[in-house]
Amino acid sequence: MDMSLLSFHSEGKIEAGLDEAGRGCMAGPVVAAAVILPPNYKHSLLNDSKKLTIKQRELLRQDIIRDALDYHVAEVSHTVIDQINILNATMKAMHKAVKGLKKQQPNLLLIDGNRFKQYTGIEHVCIVQGDGLYLSIAAASVLAKTHRDSLMERLAKEHPEYGWDVNAGYATEKHRLAMETHGLTPYHRTSFHFKPKQLDLF
């Protein structure tokens, strides 16, 4: 059985895959990436992106940046998240990622998840678990995650108690205990609530 991811959703369209990283985190920004891949693009690692090691993901990031027809990674800060809520902040990050595409203008956006706010009249399709179905979304997932992980590793040097170099700001036990012991840093989201809904907005 062929488990390869799909190269396109609608033949003849210029498709940009979109995904985010950090939606369910207690600290740091939400990051979104938009990627336009060449037609019929294939990459062996991208077919198994959920099982990648950190080293493989970094190598894949370099290949995507080299091979993509266009890509852009965008951040929305924790302060903006607190102002407009995480769902709106995620949409804002995705819109910024699409706006940042300069070499190619997509006419179809493939969105990982089941919600998206229309962007400047460009057609879009929401696909639950799309990073496991379409190469462009999987590529966007890799770029968003590696960008955000790198950022959180840098912030971890300022606040090593919270383990952000390992947990990337997610609500792990170590992170929660550090918050109880040391309080909030300037990078924490004050709007975060420890509720399952926070992690299931899509």
UniProtKB/Swiss-Prot annotation:
Q: Which CDD domains match?
A: RNase_HII_bacteria_HII_like
Decide whether keyword Ribonucleoprotein is in the record: no
User: What enzyme class is recorded for this protein?
Assistant: hydrolase
Q: Which SUPFAM superfamilies match?
A: Ribonuclease H-like
Q: Which PROSITE patterns does the protein's record reference?
A: RNASE_H_2 (PS51975)
EC number(s) reported in the record: 3.1.26.4
Cofactor dependence is on:
Mn(2+); Mg(2+)
Q: Where does a divalent metal cation bind?
A: D19, E20, D112
**Textual note on the cofactor:** Manganese or magnesium. Binds 1 divalent metal ion per monomer in the absence of substrate. May bind a second metal ion after substrate binding.
Keywords carried by this UniProt record:
Cytoplasm, Endonuclease, Hydrolase, Manganese, Metal-binding, Nuclease
**What is one process in the GO biological process aspect for this record?**
DNA replication, removal of RNA primer
Kindly report the protein's main subcellular placement as a broad class. cytoplasm
Q: Which domain of life is it from?
A: Bacteria
Which GO cellular component does the record give, naming just one?
A: ribonuclease H2 complex
Summary of the function given for this chain in its UniProt record: Endonuclease that specifically degrades the RNA of RNA-DNA hybrids.
What family does the Swiss-Prot or TrEMBL record give for this protein?
Answer: Belongs to the RNase HII family.
For this protein, the record's PANTHER family field holds: RIBONUCLEASE H2 SUBUNIT A (PTHR10954), RIBONUCLEASE HII (PTHR10954:SF18)
Name of this protein: Ribonuclease HII
Q: Which organism is it from?
A: Cytophaga hutchinsonii (strain ATCC 33406 / DSM 1761 / CIP 103989 / NBRC 15051 / NCIMB 9469 / D465)
